[in-house]
Amino acid sequence: MEEDEDQFLLSSLGVTSANPEDLEQKILDEATKKPDNDEGGSVEEKSTQLEGTNLLSSSQNELLNKLRAVKFEIDAVASTVENVDEIAAEKGLKKDDESDLQGLHSGSALQHALATDRLRSLKKRKIQLEKELTGLHGQSASSSADHGNLLRDLVKEKPSLKRKLKEIRKPSRRDGKKVKVVSFREDTDFDAVFDGASAGFVETERDELVRKGILTPFHKLDGFERRLQQPGPSNSRNLPEGDDENEDSSIIDRAVQSMSLAAKARPTTKLLDAEDLPKLEPPTAPFRRLRKLYKTPNSPDNEAKKRKAGKKSKKTRPLPEKKWRKRISREDSSLQGSGDGRRILTTSSCEEEELDDFDDADDNERSSVQLEGGLNIPECIFRKLFDYQRVGVQWLWELHCQRAGGIIGDEMGLGKTIQVLSFLGSLHFSKMYKPSIIICPVTLLRQWRREAQKWYPDFHVEILHDSAQDSGHGKGQGKASESDYDSESSVDSDHEPKSKNTKKWDSLLNRVLNSESGLLITTYEQLRLQGEKLLNIEWGYAVLDEGHRIRNPNSDITLVCKQLQTVHRIIMTGAPIQNKLTELWSLFDFVFPGKLGVLPVFEAEFSVPITVGGYANASPLQVSTAYRCAVVLRDLIMPYLLRRMKADVNAHLTKKTEHVLFCSLTVEQRSTYRAFLASSEVEQIFDGNRNSLYGIDVMRKICNHPDLLEREHSHQNPDYGNPERSGKMKVVAEVLKVWKQQGHRVLLFSQTQQMLDILESFLVANEYSYRRMDGLTPVKQRMALIDEFNNSEDMFVFVLTTKVGGLGTNLTGANRVIIFDPDWNPSNDMQARERAWRIGQKKDVTVYRLITRGTIEEKVYHRQIYKHFLTNKILKNPQQRRFFKARDMKDLFILKDDGDSNASTETSNIFSQLAEEINIVGVQSDKKPESDTQLALHKTAEGSSEQTDVEMTDKTGEAMDEETNILKSLFDAHGIHSAVNHDAIMNANDEEEKMRLEHQASQVAQRAAEALRQSRMLRSRESISVPTWTGRSGCAGAPSSVRRRFGSTVNSRLTQTGDKPSAIKNGISAGLSSGKAPSSAELLNRIRGSREQAIGVGLEQPQSSFPSSSGSSSRVGSLQPEVLIRKICSFVQQKGGSADTTSIVNHFRDIVSFNDKQLFKNLLKEIATLEKDQNRSFWVLKSEYKD
């Protein structure tokens, strides 16, 4: 029924819809059927007639490709297992001898267990594929060795499709580097690994079940897993083997059922196109007003309101109704005056039902479900959790038993808050709870409190924020923002200076700490301001909601968060990884300090090899090394990152349909747009004399409404914001009219407050009931506005800025969403959608995204699609590019001619580009979509898990930007696999050479793992509340000389008040002061220089791009401290654990420069002590470095 309504509405708007999945499948089928066609000039020659060639069937080809990919990963994982075994053998390590849990799990035990399990699964998968192949072509199971010969015959006999040689452009700053020529040809090995790893690294059965929320990453790992105890009087922990098998089969059955339910509930996305586009106007027409002014319809009620208002011209926003404001006030007062807020708190009917469950449970001595190790989950909580949420609670308990933290990276709207609160409540129920702290955006403070009282009413919740204490707070927040766009800093910061009254929060903190169920909720800004108080407390748990806020390892808020005194740290984020490996390191260094070592070592041993391996001119050794380093890194981090998608779990979500509407520019918009493109400002942008963001901002304002350019001078004009001058507003007017008649309720998002002003005037003029929330909305009113909209059917529209409130804002009262203008960052648009389409939504959701055809907005949308193609299901939310290349800039500042009858939207070309990209990875087609209908591709989160992974190749021959290469190299495993096998075939044709390269790559990966182990060892000597050394900030894990230089300065904002040196007591060292010693700057320059030198050398001399263990092969010059200390340690170990000064000096004479002499001494003293006997003196390694 609703689909018919949508079709009728879209027909009235002059647009048509199409199913993107059908279109994509059609294009892929065409590309598969005609693999020998020329597409877009990317292939130079068509394939010749294949006579006398016995080609395998498509199914056999597919199985062969998968088999080859599995074999390649088996080799990589096997080397990791062997490496861990060697380290364990050298140290004589036995699992039973490990008494310190932290030391055990930060060592090699878990990595070895995971790698062994993965190896077992891969071998099982290999046998299965070989059996399938045997059944296909009638060979015996023992003939699997012939598959390699068959593949070589295929490669040999099948004519190769040659591409143009692409010359890598020589950067101006690297004039001395030699130019390499790379030939891109279709190759069976290239296709094999691409097809076999289209979803990332080869997905094992464990990986699939974890992704679908059925198992935890620690399933069946002895010493790590904490299973549900079986009900019954015995309540035994160790189940018989038969029960284990039955459990496995039941898990598989649940997985199949879950997959089928998820497939049925999977939402669809539709592609839309505007018809009857207006003809092109003359190049530059002067901006003009409409002769007919847009005024509010005259009615008796309106006239009465005007007379009542008198001369009052200031427009005030509508406030939530009195009953909703009173509700928030009662919540604040009740929780401040009572330790048990659940008896006083006003609740909704569903919340009252929850409290009744707890009251009944009190009378019956609450029943519970027990996990191994003693965690009791109250039955009233357990039965209300979805299966994947129960797995999440189990995973949190497994981390707790390891005294480690983790990242809950579930997709937005899957209930991360519920999982955390259920776990904390279970800890309290099991008598294991200590007062904990939750840090979140300011808009979510009351939502956290309400959810805590709903899911576990025994919590004593306190909010440390002025908005929850002072009724008058927020009155001074009405000043206009200097920025046109709401940002993270402007939307969710507290906008307040540090309070002069340092004892203001003492009583509140005492109430939390003195309560056995104390739970403190505060914001990131308050944590920074009140660091003296909050950082001196030993918390049970520290939870960061929207934890991607600490992705910058050197920012103040990151360093403050990392000083919280607890080993139990949880990050909640719907966008777990952004762009760089550095951001990955920062998040993991919070939840598991030292897991990835110190940042300089991590960058030198992992980031640089992975980055170099992603370059277009990387050698086979470099590419193979990058892959093996990525394998090591994956096994380190995956158990501590839980990421489930809506498409993979049975989340009981309603259907969601998303439309992308391409709107046409009005006459005024087009003339203004063309006038700007012809202006001197654009010329200055091209010349580099003006910031490009200025021009982009102007064009985006024109797309929204041309009046925004004259806001300061014309906002009082009665005709300001006339919807007839905006193509998108004309569409909004028609859509809202129909939705109002159909009884739907709407969320209307825009990025800017200025555009919200125009939309608000439009809503007032049409007498629509509405509410508004943006960065200037007082914090105390935000929850009341949300409550009113979710519970009052009278509210028709809620207008918001895209970023206000963060990812966790729940607006399920709406079932229609309009995203007025797209964001560079696709996650911002996604989070706007997720406000309505999440757990708790009872109706089907329809989303309209408005994009102005042929303008900057379509290019923004195009780049959103590009980002979705470049990322896999773990890295779902990359940021936009921070800069543009010259050709990108010129591409942005154009307007497509709408007068061309054959013109199409830029987005419609994505499909033809998709087919071209498919050709690059092995299948070819020059057949385009049969119609010239303009198409818009919107890759939603649930849809992209099914999308065909496509390797995006730079057509101009230049390497992609560094961030993209990192993503493709580490997690987009088909990119890694493809590069590995392609280069191996092109540059190393014989098996002996391949084996030699793999051996060398394995050695480099082993050295990287060893460097990380040593770095972790250094880091573990410091308290968990001391920030890890990043090369610029922190001191934990840094060499002693660096620690003296970098650790001597503390953050003045944390220590400038107070009488006692509490900050020094906690080891606070959040950043550098402006008066640092020159030697620190020199050290930083040397680190930067050596890192750049390592990359540069890796490009031209791949086989010497990584530090060798022998001194003779090392380069003379300055070395990174972490590299030098490893060399010293290795040398002394080779000498039996002790060496005299003369031998040490002679060995390092050619390695250490004169400027590094003092650094060398300090590093030597760090790992060894000088001992003397009657005849001589010698350096002896300290005990922790002997093995």
UniProtKB/Swiss-Prot annotation:
It is an enzyme of class 3 (hydrolase). PROSITE patterns: HELICASE_ATP_BIND_1 (PS51192), HELICASE_CTER (PS51194). GO terms for molecular function: ATP binding; DNA binding; helicase activity; hydrolase activity. Keywords: ATP-binding, Coiled coil, DNA damage, DNA repair, DNA-binding, Helicase, Hydrolase, Nucleotide-binding, Nucleus, Repeat, Transcription, Transcription regulation. Disulfide bonds: none annotated. A motif (Nuclear localization signal 2) lies at residues 290-297. Belongs to the SNF2/RAD54 helicase family. This is Protein CHROMATIN REMODELING 8. It comes from Arabidopsis thaliana. The lineage of its organism: Eukaryota, Viridiplantae, Streptophyta, Embryophyta, Tracheophyta.
